[in-house]
């Protein structure tokens, strides 16, 4: 179902989009679902908050697009950018976490360490990667009320633009490391079990980019501790494709328990998400994240999934179902990506906040995060 596309919820974004004029028309999908469980709209007298999560594989252009966006909008009290917590990853939470991750995968690929040894390091490192997102989500959650939709919904008093959602470190990158052989499926599901409930108004922007161009962009950028790992690039691209398909599968009525028997344990190529697919056909379960977990390690002797792992897949379905999904085409200039993102905000869903002081507290929280852990 379309998420009330066309409402100008973010006037600052809307003004910038109008000023930028048309680009080549490559925008993204409208949201594929409007959260049905947000009947409690909150106090209509309280202001609204818009949260935009820019996510997807590393190197696709997320940070560049966000920087272009913030530059176009200029300094504002009502829009705050929440960057990746690089200082936490590299200094505060542990020393050189990214270097440790890439070196561990490299050593595994060269046969210098076993898969079990790599999994211990990767699981520990992924805890470090996920901590800032999980903590921030927890302190933000009490301020988020019900979704504010309809013609009476006021423009947001505050917009937060996040560089990644918690699912990046609690789902997508663990799953990619599993595909790379450096994390167990049990460890991936342990992270999934820790995914926080999805708050109303979660606007998730994923992206598509041809793989050759993606590899070229990744080779050109300089990030502390990063190696150019084309196998990992392929794995994380696949996981994000599966994520988009899974959200659409759930929102179009797919039920993983009913379809589980269709899985054979042999993974097929995953269709890329279509940026224009706003209300298409039901994806196959074979093309979703659920297919990754039809593996012997998770199955009882009779071939059924152990109940404990099935419960975790129920958690996965519960967390992904309410998300408002957008897909941005990054195969254009940074300005083109920025303008496409600006146009998308008209269809995004804000929420009421829960107290009169919430906007000020949220703004302070976001700025504290950026100042304390958002360095390079």
Curated annotation (Swiss-Prot):
Listed transmembrane segments: none
UniProt-listed GO biological process terms: DNA biosynthetic process; TMP biosynthetic process
Keywords of this entry: ATP-binding, DNA synthesis, Early protein, Kinase, Nucleotide-binding, Transferase
Region annotated Disordered, chain positions: 1-45
Sequence positions that bind ATP: 56-63, 217
Gene3D superfamilies reported in the protein's UniProt record: P-loop containing nucleotide triphosphate hydrolases (3.40.50.300)
A single MF term (Gene Ontology): thymidine kinase activity
EC numbers: 2.7.1.21
InterPro entries in the cross-refs: Herpes_TK, P-loop_NTPase
UniProt xrefs under SUPFAM superfamilies: P-loop containing nucleoside triphosphate hydrolases (SSF52540)
Origin: domain of life: Viruses
Active site: 84
Residues given in the record as substrate binding sites: 102, 126, 223
Catalytic activity: thymidine + ATP = dTMP + ADP + H(+)
Miscellaneous remark of the record: Phosphorylates and thereby activates certain drugs like acyclovir (ACV), valacyclovir, and famciclovir to a toxic form, that leads to successful suppression of the infection, while the uninfected cell does not have this ability because it lacks TK. Mutations in thymidine kinase may induce HSV resistance to antiviral therapies in immunocompromised patients. The most frequently observed resistant strains are unable to express TK and are avirulent in animal models of disease.
Role this protein plays: Catalyzes the transfer of the gamma-phospho group of ATP to thymidine to generate dTMP in the salvage pathway of pyrimidine synthesis. The dTMP serves as a substrate for DNA polymerase during viral DNA replication. Allows the virus to be reactivated and to grow in non-proliferative cells lacking a high concentration of phosphorylated nucleic acid precursors.
Family: Belongs to the herpesviridae thymidine kinase family.
Subunit structure: Homodimer.
Protein name: Thymidine kinase
Organism: Human herpesvirus 2 (strain HG52) (HHV-2)
Record gene name: TK
